[in-house]
Swiss-Prot record:
Residues 8-171 form the Exonuclease domain. Keywords: Cytoplasm, Exonuclease, Hydrolase, Nuclease. GO terms for biological process: DNA metabolic process. The gene is orn. The keyword Protein biosynthesis does not apply. This is Oligoribonuclease. GO terms for molecular function: 3'-5'-RNA exonuclease activity; nucleic acid binding. The keyword Transport does not apply.
Length: 181
C-alpha cells in the first residue's frame, strides 16, 4: 500500500435529498487513483443507517431510485452510523494518501462536501481545500465542444461505488477528447 502525496481520493455519497440541513447520508464509497487516474484501490462501500422517519422525508425520485437499487433496504439493515463509516473510510485512506494532500474528487463534489462538513467533519477535514470536480469539465464541454458528449456513456445507477468509477472514467474521457496535453 504505497502512500503517495499525488494519489487522488475519489468519493461519492448517496443522500436522502440535497439539503444538508434536512437530509442525511445513506451511502458512502471511496476509491484512490494515482495521478494518471489508474485505480489503485477501492475503499469500503458503506450503507449508513437512517430511521424510517428520516427515510420518509425523501422525495419521489429518491424513494424510487434508492428503493430500486436496494439501497433503502441496506440502509434499514445497516448497523453503521456516520461515525463508524468515517472511521472505516479514514482507515482505508490512511494507507494511500496522507491527510491534507488530495483534493476531494468526484462529480458535483461540492454537494458531497457540504454533507461531509455537516455530518462527517473529520472525513471532510482529511481532504485538501481544493476540489477536482469532473462536472466542471462536463459543463465546459457542453458549451465549448458539445459533440464530444455523445461519446460518453454513463449508467447512472446512483450507487456510490458505480458513480465514482464512472467519474474517474469520465475524467479520463475528457483528458483524451477535450483537454489538450
Amino acid at each position: 500500500m504505497p502512500v503517495n502525496d499525488n494519489n487522488l481520493i475519489w468519493i461519492d455519497l448517496e443522500m436522502t435529498g440535497l439539503d444538508p440541513e434536512r437530509d442525511r447520508i445513506i451511502e458512502i464509497a471511496t476509491l484512490v487513483t494515482d495521478a494518471n487516474l489508474a485505480i489503485l484501490a477501492e475503499g469500503p462501500v458503506l450503507a449508513i443507517y437512517q430511521s424510517d422517519a428520516q427515510l420518509a422525508l425523501m422525495n419521489d425520485w429518491n424513494v424510487r431510485t434508492h428503493t430500486a437499487s436496494g439501497l433503502v433496504d441496506r440502509v434499514r439493515q445497516s448497523a453503521l452510523d456516520e461515525e463508524a463509516a468515517v472511521a472505516q473510510t479514514l482507515a482505508f485512506l490512511a494507507d494511500w494518501v496522507p491527510a491534507g494532500k488530495s483534493p476531494i474528487c468526484g462529480n458535483s463534489i461540492g454537494q458531497d462536501r457540504r454533507f461531509l462538513f455537516r455530518y462527517m467533519p473529520a472525513l471532510e477535514a482529511y481532504f485538501h481545500y481544493r476540489y477536482l470536480d469532473v462536472s466542471t469539465l462536463k459543463e465546459l464541454a457542453r458549451r465549448w465542444k458539445p459533440e464530444i458528449l455523445s461519446g460518453l456513456k454513463k449508467n447512472n445507477t446512483h450507487q456510490a461505488l458505480d458513480d465514482i468509477r464512472e467519474s474517474v472514467a469520465e475524467l479520463a474521457y475528457y483528458r483524451e477528447h477535450f483537454i489538450r496535453l
